[in-house]
Amino acid sequence: MGNDVVVPTMRATTVLWDIDGTLLRSGGVAAQAFLDAVAEVTGSRPTPERRDYGGRLDPEIADMLLTAVGAAPARVADVLEALRRLVDERLGELRAQTSAYPGVDALLAKLAGAGVRQTVVTGNLASIARHKLEAGGLIPPIEPGFGGYGDSAPDRAAVARVALGRLSAAGWRPDPGEVWIVGDTPRDLACARAVGVHCALVATGRRTVGELTGLGADIVLPDLSDPRPLLSLWQI
């Protein structure tokens, strides 16, 4: 027998993207709509707080906001319905304020050209996620029909499993070692580890490179304007 060492691959054939803080910024349009939805349902408007909503599902955020105004968690469904409608009514504003981060368009196109399947794992409700992706000009190459969303499952790991299940049902069954979740929060990393896939973190959200480094991600980048380290790792 030889002394060959088998090195685990970090090749990427499937990338599951977070949206807010990772692919694009949307000017807080949906966040404002969230506060307005709670006010509409309960009659009390939440006071904007510096809470950590990053990586949370929209139903979780609705529950937190209801608690903040002393309302019953049973109103979550009502808040989410109001949220969907309010964002639909503000699509013009959303389109005007949404932009992809530097390097995102080129990176997505590069991955698509290499045959990498790309969809999303996000806490956004499905309709709102699609609106944001369309506003950012990211459909295609993102395939939202295979994504996992805040209204797909009760926690983020389950949301990722929904996305992987949808890809599998369409005949795309990658080795878990070739699947990557890319996000901007520790919750994205926890999600990736929970489902047994790789994770890249980018500091285009609210956390710095220093805050993200050391959490255990496979790679941390300041942004996606220079994706060469990522592409090298992904063997693309």
PLM ranges: what are they?
Residues A12-I19, L23-A106, G113:
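N-terminal helical cap/lid subdomain that shapes the substrate entry/recognition surface
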Residues R156-L189:
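Conserved Lys-Pro-Asp/Glu-containing loop-to-beta segment of HAD-superfamily phosphomonoesterases
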Residues I181-I219:
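Acidic, Mg2+-coordinating phosphoryl-transfer loop and its flanking beta/alpha structural elements
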Residues A72, I139-P144, R173:
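Conserved H-loop
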Residues E49-G54, A77-E81, P140-D155:
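A short, structured active-site edge motif that brings together acidic residues
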